[in-house]
Amino acid sequence: MKDNGAELTATVHYLLFYEVVDGYAEKRAPFREQHLKYARQAFERGELVLAGALAEPLDGAVLVFRGPTPHFAEAFAKGDPYVINGLIKSWRVRKCMTVIPSEQS
């Protein structure tokens, strides 16, 4: 990847986008602890970099995964208590070429 002729080093991340159901804030309560535990485990394994809900309106979430393939993000979604219990209308994974910060900085 080049920026004004200079070589940039990119780190591959995968973004997991969730679209949540109407009434998500209320409906998630019974599954929230399970979901957070599941996310913490992925973080502790070094797969999940950061995660959070999209606010105003609360209509989705974004989770950032590291790795050479979308495997960790896809596997996370398939096993997430929010997905399993119908709180997520849809999810998708997109590759992101991160240049700032780079892992070399």
Enumerate the predicted regions with their spans.
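Conserved, structured core segments of small domains
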Residues: 1-105
